[in-house]
Every structure is written in structure tokens, then in C-alpha cells.
């Protein structure tokens, strides 16, 4: 089996690329970073530090790399069996034209063996969004062929891969946590279902997408925002602060109550999942900066994301949400010189006041009780 993976960054190398290569799949990375491309093509291998209770070093080998802009990547799309991405939600639109060109070439070469494309991004149904961009870039006469022969498979991914400086200045070395979860929608594949250790197949993807969004992402963001306010440097420092831990755990329990109502998750198993996530935040090997985790607060405060979406669920089912409100208020306080969204958030609050600003960002009704609760919590933090 041959695969092309867009994005040779830390998540690409440390998570998806590693699983594919470990499964014996012939893997090529596509990226724009020439230093990384040159290193991959010189060595065809790299090291991954897997850290949890213990630390181990795995070597990923037999990999190649091409530029994601150029003819090589188009040629590969015409030949491979699987295309995966870990490029970040914003970049999906930028890689779509190259994918479209590759699919046209595949059609021209009469390659009708099934191709499956899986976007492994921190977003809900990212592959469906990528498909929209690819379809827009395709000529009309290729669209029906692509619908017939190409599967666009949505997935939920979960593994913390913090940026970490290599002790050896090796541009390929990467550190990842032991935990990893890659859940894919088995109803969207073309052809036979792949057997890749570490890839879990489900016919109820949204339950797992929301479980991760409402637990890991919600908890991570609130830890970062409260941690930043309290002057902590890392996620570990923040979650070891008992006051912060109580709010984060409470928020995950509130969002968990929504999941249990909506999808029928087992309450005891979900409580154990929350404990596992708190343990991941404490991982001493992951020097995960609160500023990195908190960045892009406008996106994180939008209606479909990790703070507002679970809050809307609590309103839908008439459930408590005090800790989620605390997290939202802390997010409104997020300031970072390196993050344009943090600056935009500050300007919006200064210009319109917290009530109108939160309503504009989140889509919540400015006159609603929850916005009033969030504004009260926001002011109490000043």
C-alpha cells in the first residue's frame, strides 16, 4: 500500500506518518519546508520520542518526501492508495488545487483503483470541508469520476504533540505522548477497509468527534486560559494548581453530561476518560506552553468550537454549566503579543464591551442569560 501525507510537521511525523510507516505502508511526506524535505530524503528515517509514564525512542524508517507545490505531488496522487493530511484547518484550502490536479491525472491514466483521502485535523468533519475545496478546484467533467472512485473519509484525531527543541538540533526529531487516538468514519471509504494498527473504524464518528472536542479540547483550552491568567507557564503547572484543576474537571464533567445525554456514553467510562485526560495534562515530559494552547481565541470561542458548543448542549438539555462559563470568561481575557486573534479579541472588547463582543464572536444572543453569566464571570476576573 502506498500513502501520501501532506504536512511533515510535528503532528505529521509524530502521529499519522508514524502510524502509517509502522504499518509497513510506503509513505511519502509532502511539505513546503525545504530543510525538512532535504533531511527526510537524505536519511529516509527519523526518531520519535514517545513519552508517558516512561520514555522510549522509536525510529520511523523507509519514508520519502516531496514538495507539496510542484509536479511530484500531483504524480503521486495519481498513483497512491491513501492520502492523509495534518496541515492545520486553514491550510486545507491551499492544498486542494494540487489534490484536484492529481485526481484529474489519475482519471487521465484510467487508474480506477480506490483512493481514500483522510484529513487528520483538529476540526469537525475536516475531510468533508477538504472535499468541498477539492470539488471547487476540479473541472466539471472530472467530478462524477471522483465521486465514484475517491473516498473522502472524516476522522477524529487525538495526540498531544508539543513543539519541542531537539537536544541534537535535528529538524526531524519529535516528541509525542504515549496516548493516541485516530478514529475514522468507516461508512465513507471506497473499496476494502484498511487494516492499520492505531486507526479505529466507527460508524458513529460524530459521537467520538464531540467526545474529543468536548473533553480534551475543552479541558486543554480552559487549562491554558486559566493558567495564563494565574501566571503559569505550562499546561502541567496550570493543571497542578488545585483551583484551576477543579474548574477544568468541572467543565469536562458538564460537557460530559451533554455527551452522555446525546450519544448514550457510559457515565463511568466517561468519568475514567476525563481522569485519563487530566493525567495527560500532567505529563512532565510534555512542556506544553499555555500561550501555544490558548492561541486563536476567536476560533475557540466560535459557535461550533470547544467552549461554546458544549455550552449550547447544556442549554439544550437544561444542564449546569458554571465551569464552562468560567472557561469562556478566561478565554475572553487571553492576551498574547504573538497571536493576531488575541489582539483582535482585545480590540473588540475595548471597542464594543464584553457583552456585545462575546455575542459577536460566539453567535450567542447578547441579551441571553448565559452571556450575562459570562460577562459577570469575566468582570470578576479583572
Curated annotation (Swiss-Prot):
Binding locations of NAD(+): 3-14
Name recorded for this polypeptide: Mannitol-1-phosphate 5-dehydrogenase
UniProt record similarity statement: Belongs to the mannitol dehydrogenase family.
Catalytic activity: D-mannitol 1-phosphate + NAD(+) = beta-D-fructose 6-phosphate + NADH + H(+)
Classification of source organism: Bacteria, Pseudomonadati, Pseudomonadota, Gammaproteobacteria, Enterobacterales
Residue list for modification N6-acetyllysine: 269
Any one GO molecular-function label of the UniProt entry: mannitol-1-phosphate 5-dehydrogenase activity
InterPro entries membership: 6-PGluconate_DH-like_C_sf, 6PGD_dom2, Mannitol_1_phos_5_DH, Mannitol_DH, Mannitol_DH_C, Mannitol_DH_CS, Mannitol_DH_N, NAD(P)-bd_dom_sf
EC numbers for this chain: 1.1.1.17
BP GO annotations: mannitol catabolic process
Amino acid at each position: 500500500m502506498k500513502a501520501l501525507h501532506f504536512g511533515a510537521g510535528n503532528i505529521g511525523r509524530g502521529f499519522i506518518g508514524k502510524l502509517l510507516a509502522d504499518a509497513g505502508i510506503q509513505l511519502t511526506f509532502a511539505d513546503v519546508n525545504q530543510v525538512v524535505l532535504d533531511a527526510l530524503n537524505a536519511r529516509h528515517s527519523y526518531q520519535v520520542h514517545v513519552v508517558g509514564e516512561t520514555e522510549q525512542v522509536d525510529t520511523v524508517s523507509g519514508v520519502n518526501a516531496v514538495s507539496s507545490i510542484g509536479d511530484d505531488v500531483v504524480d503521486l496522487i495519481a498513483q497512491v492508495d491513501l492520502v492523509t493530511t495534518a496541515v492545520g484547518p486553514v491550510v486545507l484550502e491551499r492544498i486542494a488545487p494540487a489534490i484536484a490536479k492529481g485526481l484529474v491525472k489519475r482519471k487521465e491514466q484510467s487508474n480506477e483503483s480506490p483512493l481514500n483521502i483522510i484529513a487528520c485535523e483538529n476540526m469537525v468533519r475536516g475531510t468533508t470541508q477538504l472535499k468541498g475545496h477539492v470539488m471547487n478546484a476540479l473541472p466539471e467533467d472530472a467530478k462524477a469520476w471522483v465521486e465514484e472512485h475517491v473516498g473522502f473519509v472524516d476522522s477524529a484525531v487525538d495526540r498531544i504533540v508539543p513543539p519541542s527543541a531537539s537536544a541534537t538540533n535535528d529538524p526531524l526529531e519529535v516528541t509525542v505522548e504515549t496516548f493516541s487516538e485516530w478514529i475514522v468514519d468507516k461508512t465513507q471509504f471506497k473499496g476494502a477497509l484498511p487494516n492499520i494498527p492505531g486507526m479505529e473504524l466507527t460508524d458513529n464518528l460524530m459521537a467520538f468527534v464531540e467526545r474529543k472536542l468536548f473533553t480534551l479540547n475543552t479541558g486543554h483550552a480552559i487549562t491554558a486560559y486559566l493558567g495564563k491568567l494565574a501566571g503559569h507557564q505550562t499546561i502541567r503547572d496550570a493543571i497542578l494548581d488545585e483551583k484551576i484543576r477543579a474548574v477544568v474537571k468541572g467543565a469536562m464533567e458538564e460537557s460530559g453530561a451533554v455527551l452522555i445525554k446525546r450519544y448514550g456514553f457510559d457515565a463511568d467510562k466517561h468519568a475514567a476518560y476525563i481522569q485519563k485526560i487530566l493525567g495527560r495534562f500532567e505529563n512532565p515530559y510534555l512542556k506544553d506552553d499555555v500561550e501555544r494552547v490558548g492561541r486563536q481565541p476567536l476560533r475557540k470561542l466560535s459557535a461550533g468550537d470547544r467552549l461554546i458548543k458544549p455550552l449550547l448542549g447544556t442549554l439544550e438539555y437544561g444542564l449546569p454549566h458554571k465551569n464552562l462559563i468560567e472557561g469562556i470568561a478566561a478565554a475572553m481575557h487571553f492576551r498574547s503579543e504573538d497571536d493576531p486573534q488575541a489582539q483582535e479579541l482585545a480590540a473588540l472588547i475595548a471597542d464594543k464591551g464584553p457583552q456585545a463582543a462575546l455575542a459577536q464572536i460566539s453567535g450567542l444572543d447578547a441579551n441571553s442569560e448565559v452571556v450575562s453569566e459570562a460577562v459577570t464571570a469575566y468582570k470578576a476576573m479583572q
